[in-house]
A protein has these predicted regions:
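Catalytic-histidine neighborhood of serine endopeptidases
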Residues: 35-80
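Generic structural detector for well-ordered beta-strands
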Residues: 201-203
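Residue-level preference for non-acidic, small/hydrophobic
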Residues: 21, 111-112, 146, 212, ...
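Short pre-catalytic segments that frame enzyme active sites
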Residues: 1-8, 26-52, 181-196, 206-253
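Small/polar-residue-rich segments within soluble enzyme cores
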Residues: 27, 64-74, 80-196
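Core beta-strand residues in small-molecule sensory/regulatory alpha/beta domains
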Residues: 17-18, 233
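Extracytoplasmic
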Residues: 9-12, 19, 26-32, 124, ...
Protein backbone atom coordinates (compact mmCIF):
# COMPACT_ATOMS: atom_id res chain seq x y z
CA UNK A 1 0.00 0.00 0.00
CA UNK A 2 1.35 3.45 -0.84
CA UNK A 3 0.31 7.06 -1.13
CA UNK A 4 1.93 9.70 -3.32
CA UNK A 5 1.98 13.48 -3.02
CA UNK A 6 3.26 15.95 -5.59
CA UNK A 7 5.47 18.63 -4.07
CA UNK A 8 6.77 21.75 -5.80
CA UNK A 9 10.50 22.20 -5.24
CA UNK A 10 11.19 25.95 -5.50
CA UNK A 11 14.17 27.10 -7.53
CA UNK A 12 16.77 29.17 -5.71
CA UNK A 13 16.72 32.77 -6.92
CA UNK A 14 20.03 34.04 -8.24
CA UNK A 15 22.20 36.52 -6.36
CA UNK A 16 23.05 40.06 -7.44
CA UNK A 17 26.69 41.20 -7.18
CA UNK A 18 28.63 44.41 -7.70
CA UNK A 19 31.46 44.65 -10.24
CA UNK A 20 33.94 43.24 -7.69
CA UNK A 21 31.72 40.26 -6.89
CA UNK A 22 30.56 41.69 -3.56
CA UNK A 23 27.10 40.38 -2.69
CA UNK A 24 24.40 43.04 -3.00
CA UNK A 25 21.30 40.83 -2.82
CA UNK A 26 21.08 37.16 -1.90
CA UNK A 27 18.61 34.48 -0.84
CA UNK A 28 19.01 33.17 2.71
CA UNK A 29 17.07 30.22 4.18
CA UNK A 30 15.04 30.78 7.34
CA UNK A 31 12.88 28.25 9.14
CA UNK A 32 9.56 28.24 10.93
CA UNK A 33 10.03 25.67 13.68
CA UNK A 34 7.07 23.30 13.85
CA UNK A 35 5.94 20.20 15.69
CA UNK A 36 3.41 17.61 14.55
CA UNK A 37 1.84 16.17 17.68
CA UNK A 38 -0.70 13.96 15.92
CA UNK A 39 0.50 10.97 13.88
CA UNK A 40 -1.25 10.58 10.52
CA UNK A 41 -1.34 7.03 9.18
CA UNK A 42 -4.13 5.06 7.50
CA UNK A 43 -2.86 1.91 9.19
CA UNK A 44 -4.53 2.12 12.61
CA UNK A 45 -2.11 -0.28 14.27
CA UNK A 46 0.95 1.57 12.97
CA UNK A 47 -0.65 4.90 13.90
CA UNK A 48 -1.36 3.81 17.47
CA UNK A 49 2.17 2.49 17.90
CA UNK A 50 3.80 5.61 16.45
CA UNK A 51 1.56 7.92 18.50
CA UNK A 52 2.43 6.12 21.72
CA UNK A 53 6.15 6.42 20.96
CA UNK A 54 5.93 10.12 20.09
CA UNK A 55 3.81 10.98 23.13
CA UNK A 56 5.90 9.04 25.64
CA UNK A 57 9.25 10.36 24.40
CA UNK A 58 7.90 13.91 24.26
CA UNK A 59 6.65 13.83 27.86
CA UNK A 60 9.95 12.38 29.03
CA UNK A 61 11.96 14.99 27.12
CA UNK A 62 9.91 18.20 27.23
CA UNK A 63 11.97 19.73 30.06
CA UNK A 64 15.24 18.97 28.26
CA UNK A 65 13.83 20.31 24.99
CA UNK A 66 12.72 23.55 26.68
CA UNK A 67 16.13 23.95 28.30
CA UNK A 68 17.92 23.31 25.01
CA UNK A 69 15.74 25.73 23.06
CA UNK A 70 16.29 28.44 25.67
CA UNK A 71 20.05 27.98 25.17
CA UNK A 72 19.59 28.43 21.40
CA UNK A 73 17.08 31.30 21.72
CA UNK A 74 18.02 33.09 25.00
CA UNK A 75 15.39 35.81 24.45
CA UNK A 76 12.75 33.20 25.30
CA UNK A 77 12.55 31.46 28.69
CA UNK A 78 12.45 27.74 29.41
CA UNK A 79 8.98 28.28 30.84
CA UNK A 80 7.82 29.81 27.56
CA UNK A 81 9.03 26.85 25.53
CA UNK A 82 7.54 24.27 27.88
CA UNK A 83 4.20 26.06 28.00
CA UNK A 84 4.13 26.46 24.22
CA UNK A 85 5.03 22.84 23.57
CA UNK A 86 2.56 21.48 26.11
CA UNK A 87 -0.24 23.56 24.60
CA UNK A 88 0.38 21.99 21.20
CA UNK A 89 0.67 18.55 22.76
CA UNK A 90 -2.58 18.82 24.72
CA UNK A 91 -4.46 20.05 21.65
CA UNK A 92 -2.77 17.43 19.43
CA UNK A 93 -1.92 20.07 16.85
CA UNK A 94 0.02 19.44 13.66
CA UNK A 95 2.19 22.14 12.14
CA UNK A 96 2.31 23.72 15.61
CA UNK A 97 4.59 26.75 15.48
CA UNK A 98 6.98 26.70 18.42
CA UNK A 99 8.13 30.28 17.83
CA UNK A 100 5.26 32.01 15.96
CA UNK A 101 7.04 35.37 15.71
CA UNK A 102 10.56 34.17 15.07
CA UNK A 103 12.17 32.62 12.01
CA UNK A 104 15.20 30.49 12.83
CA UNK A 105 18.48 30.67 10.94
CA UNK A 106 19.99 27.56 9.38
CA UNK A 107 22.44 27.20 12.27
CA UNK A 108 19.69 27.59 14.88
CA UNK A 109 17.59 24.98 13.09
CA UNK A 110 20.50 22.53 13.01
CA UNK A 111 21.09 23.06 16.74
CA UNK A 112 17.42 22.33 17.47
CA UNK A 113 17.73 19.04 15.57
CA UNK A 114 20.25 17.86 18.16
CA UNK A 115 17.67 17.97 20.97
CA UNK A 116 15.83 14.90 22.32
CA UNK A 117 12.99 13.75 20.03
CA UNK A 118 13.78 16.61 17.64
CA UNK A 119 16.78 14.61 16.41
CA UNK A 120 14.44 11.91 15.09
CA UNK A 121 13.25 11.91 11.50
CA UNK A 122 10.18 14.18 11.10
CA UNK A 123 7.92 11.22 10.38
CA UNK A 124 8.95 9.65 13.68
CA UNK A 125 9.60 12.54 16.06
CA UNK A 126 7.29 15.15 14.53
CA UNK A 127 9.73 18.08 14.59
CA UNK A 128 10.46 19.85 11.32
CA UNK A 129 11.41 23.24 9.93
CA UNK A 130 9.36 24.84 7.16
CA UNK A 131 11.96 26.54 4.99
CA UNK A 132 11.42 29.96 3.48
CA UNK A 133 13.96 31.78 1.35
CA UNK A 134 14.34 35.44 2.27
CA UNK A 135 15.96 38.10 0.10
CA UNK A 136 18.61 39.94 2.09
CA UNK A 137 20.72 42.99 1.30
CA UNK A 138 24.02 42.81 3.23
CA UNK A 139 24.64 46.54 2.66
CA UNK A 140 21.20 47.56 3.88
CA UNK A 141 19.65 50.47 1.99
CA UNK A 142 22.73 51.02 -0.20
CA UNK A 143 21.61 51.15 -3.87
CA UNK A 144 18.28 49.80 -2.69
CA UNK A 145 16.16 51.57 -5.32
CA UNK A 146 18.38 50.38 -8.13
CA UNK A 147 18.52 46.81 -6.88
CA UNK A 148 14.77 46.72 -6.38
CA UNK A 149 12.76 44.30 -4.31
CA UNK A 150 10.19 41.53 -4.24
CA UNK A 151 6.65 42.14 -3.01
CA UNK A 152 7.62 40.29 0.17
CA UNK A 153 11.04 39.07 1.30
CA UNK A 154 9.68 35.52 1.30
CA UNK A 155 7.81 35.99 -1.98
CA UNK A 156 9.24 35.28 -5.41
CA UNK A 157 7.34 37.92 -7.36
CA UNK A 158 9.59 40.79 -8.44
CA UNK A 159 8.31 44.29 -7.77
CA UNK A 160 10.80 46.80 -9.20
CA UNK A 161 14.45 47.63 -9.96
CA UNK A 162 16.95 45.06 -11.19
CA UNK A 163 14.92 42.35 -9.47
CA UNK A 164 12.11 43.05 -11.94
CA UNK A 165 14.18 43.96 -14.99
CA UNK A 166 16.14 40.69 -14.84
CA UNK A 167 13.48 38.54 -13.21
CA UNK A 168 13.50 35.95 -16.01
CA UNK A 169 17.24 35.41 -15.43
CA UNK A 170 17.15 35.44 -11.63
CA UNK A 171 14.06 33.36 -10.84
CA UNK A 172 14.97 29.94 -12.28
CA UNK A 173 12.49 27.09 -12.86
CA UNK A 174 10.69 25.18 -10.12
CA UNK A 175 10.98 21.40 -9.92
CA UNK A 176 8.53 18.67 -8.93
CA UNK A 177 9.14 15.77 -6.57
CA UNK A 178 7.02 13.00 -5.11
CA UNK A 179 6.87 12.17 -1.45
CA UNK A 180 5.87 8.50 -1.53
CA UNK A 181 4.84 6.48 1.47
CA UNK A 182 5.26 2.71 1.20
CA UNK A 183 3.84 1.10 4.34
CA UNK A 184 5.66 2.92 7.17
CA UNK A 185 8.54 4.33 5.14
CA UNK A 186 8.64 7.53 3.11
CA UNK A 187 10.85 8.11 0.09
CA UNK A 188 11.37 11.27 -1.97
CA UNK A 189 11.61 10.95 -5.76
CA UNK A 190 12.53 13.86 -8.01
CA UNK A 191 10.46 13.94 -11.21
CA UNK A 192 11.83 17.23 -12.50
CA UNK A 193 14.81 18.83 -10.83
CA UNK A 194 14.60 22.52 -9.98
CA UNK A 195 16.85 24.75 -12.07
CA UNK A 196 18.24 27.53 -9.91
CA UNK A 197 18.27 31.08 -11.22
CA UNK A 198 21.39 32.66 -12.66
CA UNK A 199 23.46 35.20 -10.76
CA UNK A 200 23.63 38.78 -12.00
CA UNK A 201 26.82 40.81 -11.93
CA UNK A 202 26.24 44.55 -12.19
CA UNK A 203 28.61 47.39 -13.05
CA UNK A 204 27.89 49.03 -9.69
CA UNK A 205 30.89 49.48 -7.40
CA UNK A 206 29.65 49.32 -3.82
CA UNK A 207 32.43 51.60 -2.53
CA UNK A 208 31.67 54.29 -5.12
CA UNK A 209 27.94 53.88 -4.47
CA UNK A 210 28.52 54.40 -0.75
CA UNK A 211 30.62 57.51 -1.33
CA UNK A 212 28.05 58.94 -3.77
CA UNK A 213 25.16 58.40 -1.35
CA UNK A 214 27.02 60.04 1.53
CA UNK A 215 27.99 63.00 -0.67
CA UNK A 216 24.46 63.66 -1.92
CA UNK A 217 22.95 63.37 1.57
CA UNK A 218 25.48 65.93 2.80
CA UNK A 219 24.62 68.31 -0.06
CA UNK A 220 20.88 67.92 0.42
CA UNK A 221 21.32 68.96 4.05
CA UNK A 222 23.73 71.77 3.15
CA UNK A 223 21.43 73.24 0.49
CA UNK A 224 18.16 72.31 2.20
CA UNK A 225 17.18 70.70 -1.10
CA UNK A 226 14.21 68.41 -1.76
CA UNK A 227 15.75 66.07 -4.34
CA UNK A 228 19.17 65.02 -5.57
CA UNK A 229 20.35 62.63 -8.27
CA UNK A 230 23.86 61.37 -8.98
CA UNK A 231 25.04 59.03 -11.73
CA UNK A 232 28.70 58.01 -11.77
CA UNK A 233 29.85 56.61 -15.10
CA UNK A 234 33.24 55.32 -16.18
CA UNK A 235 34.00 57.43 -19.25
CA UNK A 236 36.13 54.80 -21.01
CA UNK A 237 33.59 51.96 -20.87
CA UNK A 238 30.28 53.65 -20.15
CA UNK A 239 29.82 51.41 -17.11
CA UNK A 240 27.56 52.94 -14.48
CA UNK A 241 29.37 52.67 -11.14
CA UNK A 242 26.78 54.34 -8.93
CA UNK A 243 23.20 55.58 -9.14
CA UNK A 244 21.71 57.70 -6.37
CA UNK A 245 18.22 59.18 -6.26
CA UNK A 246 17.56 60.82 -2.90
CA UNK A 247 14.56 62.83 -1.73
CA UNK A 248 13.25 64.04 1.60
CA UNK A 249 10.66 61.93 3.37
CA UNK A 250 7.37 63.17 4.83
CA UNK A 251 9.18 64.22 8.00
CA UNK A 252 11.65 66.34 6.07
CA UNK A 253 14.59 64.01 6.64
Amino acid sequence: RFTKNNIVEPALRGNIYDCNYKLLVGSVPEYRLCMDFKVIDKDSLARTKAQHYRDSVFLQSVDSIAMGMHAIFPDYTEEYFKERLMKGFNEKKNGWSILPRHMATFIEYQECKKLPLFRERPYKGGFHGDEQMRRKKPYGSLASRTLGSLYRDSDRVAKNGLELAYDSILRGTDGIKHNTKVRNARVDFTDRAAVDGNDLMTTIDVDIQDAAEKAIVAQLKNLDAELGIVIVMEAKTGDVKAIVNMSRDANGN
